[in-house]
Amino acid sequence: MKHIRNFSIIAHIDHGKSTLSDRLIQVCGGLTDREMAEQVLDSMDLERERGITIKAQSVTLDYTAKNGETYQLNFIDTPGHVDFSYEVSRSLAACEGALLVVDAGQGVEAQTLANCYTALEMDLEVVPVLNKIDLPQAEPERVAAEIEDIVGIEATDAVRCSAKTGVGIGEVLETIVAQIPSPEGDPEAPLQALIIDSWFDSYLGVVSLVRIKNGVLKKGDKFKVMSTGQAYNADRVGIFTPKMKDQAELKTGQVGYVIAGIKEIHGAPVGDTLTLAKHGADKPLPGFKKAKPQVYAGVFTISTDDYESFRDALNKLSLNDASLQFEPETSSALGFGFRIGYLGLLHMEIIQERLEREYDLDLITTAPTVEYEVLLTNGETLYVDNPSDLPATNYIEEMREPIVQANILVPKEYLGNVITLCIEKRGVQKNMVYHGNQVALTYDIPAAEVVMDFFDRLKSTSRGYASLEYNFIRFEPADMVRLDVLINGDRVDALAMIIHRSNIRHKGIALVDKMKELIPRQMFDIAIQAAVGNQVVARSTVKALRKDVTAKCYGGDVSRKKKLLQKQKEGKKRMKQLGNVEVPQEAFLAVLKLNE
């Protein structure tokens, strides 16, 4: 056991952790050179295309150190994007240490900081590594000082390496062996294994990635899941070398997989504890807190026949992504669908893209909203995440919106732009600290403003240098109202949104103008109105197409022309009473892109 090292790599997006993991695998001979693909661990197509890591993956490598001993390194790759910090906390729960990888050209960024604090809170040993020292703009001394200044861990003798060229990889491995503690646990105690991740394989059923904390799990053992009490047989246990490799048993401190032919999807929830069915442990391991969705959106299939397959797809996906939550929803405009809770907008895009890609569905998403706390006049408290569930104004005592604490790191030359952006988003400045060239800002910002497009705007006002990390702190009373869109006097529920009263006119006008461009002209006038309660705040009209009925009259009497025009007018009026307007797909998407 003292030769096992469990660690993960924490880094900001694009600081090179996937490349570094490739090198570690290569040096330890996990794969032959022929099988070595770039970013081995980013196995999803989507991950490769966007160049980001979404799912945590694990690998077990054997490394022969300079002192002649052979160590087993279990290493878990983690995502770096702010939306996936939950995946990171799960990976860290299974480790004793973490490599903090920092790009020697870029320096420390907010996300690195957030994940690093998570690691330090869990009492992990954090080992700084300066990556990309082959770049001409690398300044290892400055960055090492920055790590000490901002993060507060010893970094003067941090390992310097370049994952791309392979320089310094040996030192990284030596440092892991020297600095990261070996796992603690009792091989004789009853089995306790933490489920770090689980996914569905259509051939094997549910595959669970586990970390053995105490005891031993042998192939063929009967084990039970502690939260559900269900028992299964361990058909196969083994490790990833990135390929699956069966073993006779998983010992204390190891990280590996268990396949037990679990068919139903929620059979092995992530964060749960496995123990033996006979002589099991009394209490489960402290898991990690459930991730709470920050953003909600209705998702509907374009053709109603896909509803069943959409539901199955969501079930399979939610197995793989523990933070996904959903419930059925119906809309008069879009039919049947689901209300899905996401961690953030990137998460939302990725889930939608995975559904469309891996399950071949055509989907349409309504505008994302956050969860509001509503105090009713009779003293009840409701939580509303769907604008159409909001009670009428006269029943509402007060609306409270979620406030998040946003920590922003930005180079000082872009400070002005970022502060302007935060004020525009109704933010309140709480703190501002200078660290060398960087400024750390802390703002309280309404969650609704952050989830829409704050991240993209922040990146664009600071040329990509600012970085953001946020977490929910409290609900705060706010003057929020529901903006409805009426088309020919009919409410379209899927277009409603909850916004702040100060934005009504601005948003309302922008919305109706956008809809006017997108709704095709009919044979009659279409009135598009934006209203709050019964008060219309903006309107525009899609003019009717008309036939020139007087074209065949030449000269002649004016009353003849009047008669024809009058007849046309009556026809249009009758059509307008009967006609209903199709709202095209683009119109729903336009609501999402209003701010641009």
Curated annotation (Swiss-Prot):
Residues where GTP binds: D14, H15, G16, K17, S18, T19, N131, K132, I133, D134
Catalysed reactions, semicolon-separated: GTP + H2O = GDP + phosphate + H(+)
Gene Ontology terms for molecular function: GTP binding; GTPase activity; guanosine tetraphosphate binding; ribosome binding; translation elongation factor activity
Gene3D superfamilies, per the entry: 3.30.70.240, Elongation factor 4, C-terminal domain (3.30.70.2570), Elongation Factor G (Translational Gtpase), domain 3 (3.30.70.870), P-loop containing nucleotide triphosphate hydrolases (3.40.50.300), Translation factors (2.40.30.10)
Keyword terms of this UniProt record: Cell inner membrane, Cell membrane, GTP-binding, Hydrolase, Membrane, Nucleotide-binding, Protein biosynthesis
Domain tr-type G: 2-184
Top enzyme category: hydrolase
Location of this chain's protein in the cell: Cell inner membrane
Entry GO terms, CC: plasma membrane
GO biological process: positive regulation of translation
Protein purpose: Required for accurate and efficient protein synthesis under certain stress conditions. May act as a fidelity factor of the translation reaction, by catalyzing a one-codon backward translocation of tRNAs on improperly translocated ribosomes. Back-translocation proceeds from a post-translocation (POST) complex to a pre-translocation (PRE) complex, thus giving elongation factor G a second chance to translocate the tRNAs correctly. Binds to ribosomes in a GTP-dependent manner.
Family, per entry: Belongs to the TRAFAC class translation factor GTPase superfamily. Classic translation factor GTPase family. LepA subfamily.
NCBIfam families membership: lepA (TIGR01393), small_GTP (TIGR00231)
Protein name: Elongation factor 4
Organism in which the protein naturally occurs: Shewanella amazonensis (strain ATCC BAA-1098 / SB2B)
